[in-house]
Amino acid sequence: MNTHNAYENVIVRDVFDLARRECNCHGVAVTGASLGAYHATNIAFRHPDAVSHLISLSGSFDISSFFHGYHDDNIYFNSPYEYLPNTPNPWKYNHMGIILGTGEWDNTRHESYRLSEILNSKGVKHWLDDGKWRGHDWNYWRDMLPYYLSKL
């Protein structure tokens, strides 16, 4: 987790700072597909002050299988399924435009639904888009991302 946390710090400090300077804006949009959607989602919810929009494509958010039963605070605070239900201030996410994209052939579809249920339970505004004829692969994501960007 130390390497992951260092990676996240580079993204939030260096990449986000560069994006804000280049675009002359306060918040940045983050997106990713599959495990990349996990990273984008985790960064967005851990740093809501820096993120204006989140687009998750076929997100895979359950990281527990990577640790074979090991669990500590680093894992807890990097697992949206764990820390989001316990957040005392869900209002801090409502400025973000949040899109969770999935489809009927997406093998991680249940994960987007689970995240949506958590967000609903906390009153966090978002759009769960469950499209027909969509799966968990690049050919679907190539169509989904431009569509979602057009909705921002």
What residue spans do the PLM features occupy?
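Non-catalytic cap/lid and distal C-terminal segments of serine-dependent acyl enzymes
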Residues: 1-152
